[in-house]
């Protein structure tokens, strides 16, 4: 047993250090998988899986050096973007310099599909801000570094009457602006990019004009259905002299009578023609 322990101790003492040629090359500021999945390693800062300048823990070796990694420079996250690098470090990779794109924007490690635009919005500064409120009314205006501007003024007379504007820079680089008024007539906005109602078809326009003329002339059509000839006597219809039913004494009808009788009475049975059928 003592011999076994002694041999183990001698083996450990005589064990040579693993030569660097059996390990991946040492990382530097421009390559590797560095700062890696969690920022600072368990034995130091700025490296990949291990501590400073080391890999899994061996001094002078490791998978990545300071300032490299999936997320870019120091403090970069796990993603395509980051401060100045993509997959390969500061000098190259899938994205350009300065956090211009990628799923991880800048050193904050936040998700951003818009890349640099989202970073500009998140870091926008207020350039101007004025706000004044009195018993008679109010007025305010502000402007930010990412192109947002707004202003409004209003007075408390017969309710609240106000007017103002709002503008911003879109993702396409164009400026969009809206002006508005709000008073007893409601909220009315104007802007070049706002949708407009389609034109009224010519047939509908003519119908509306005709309805307006009829209403001015006292003709009212409420859309109720009225059958043809309903409530009307006269020459046509089911009534008339010699007809099946009385009427106002017109000329026609179902009956075969001539001039008819006053009041439109039906033809008597004695006056009607008869047909005799003889059985042999």
UniProtKB/Swiss-Prot annotation:
Molecular function (Gene Ontology), one example: structural constituent of chitin-based larval cuticle
Keyword Signal (UniProt): yes
Residue ranges, annotated region (Disordered): 258-280
Gene Ontology CC terms: chitin-based extracellular matrix
Any coiled-coil regions, as ranges: none
Pfam family membership, one: Chitin_bind_4
Domain Chitin-binding type R&R per the UniProt entry, residue ranges: 135-198
Keyword Protein biosynthesis: no
Keyword terms: Cuticle, Signal
Signal peptide: 1-15
Designated name of the protein: Pupal cuticle protein 36a
Organism this protein belongs to: Manduca sexta (Tobacco hawkmoth)
Taxonomic classification: Eukaryota, Metazoa, Ecdysozoa, Arthropoda, Hexapoda
Gene coding for it: PCP36a
């Amino acid at each position: 047993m003592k011999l076994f322990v002694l041999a183990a101790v001698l083996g450990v003492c005589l064990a040579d250090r693993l030569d660097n040629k059996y390990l991946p090359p040492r990382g530097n500021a421009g390559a590797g998988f560095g700062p890696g999945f969690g920022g600072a390693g368990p034995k130091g800062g700025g490296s990949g899986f291990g501590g400073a300048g080391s890999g899994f823990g061996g001094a002078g070796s490791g998978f990545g050096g300071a300032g490299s990694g999936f997320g870019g420079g120091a403090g970069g996250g796990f993603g395509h973007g980051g401060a100045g690098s993509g997959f390969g470090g500061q000098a190259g990779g899938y994205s350009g310099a300065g956090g211009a794109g990628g799923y991880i924007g800048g050193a904050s490690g936040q998700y951003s599909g818009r890349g640099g635009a989202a970073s500009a919005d998140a870091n926008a500064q207020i350039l101007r801000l004025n706000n004044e409120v009195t018993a008679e009314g109010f007025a305010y205006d502000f402007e930010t570094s990412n192109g947002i501007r707004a202003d409004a003024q209003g007075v408390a007379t017969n309710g609240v009457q106000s007017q103002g504007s709002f503008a911003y820079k879109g993702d396409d680089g164009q400026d969009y602006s809206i002006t508005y008024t709000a008073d007893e007539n409601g909220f009315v906005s104007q802007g070049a990019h706002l949708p407009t109602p389609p034109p009224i078809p010519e047939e509908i326009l003519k119908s509306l004009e005709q309805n307006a003329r009829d209403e001015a002339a006292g003709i009212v059509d409420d859309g109720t259905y009225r059958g043809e000839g309903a409530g009307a006597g006269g020459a046509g219809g089911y009534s008339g002299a010699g007809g099946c039913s009385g009427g106002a004494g017109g000329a026609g009808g179902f009956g075969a009578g001539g001039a008819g009788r006053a009041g439109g009475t039906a033809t008597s049975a004695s006056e009607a023609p008869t047909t005799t059928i003889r059985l042999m």
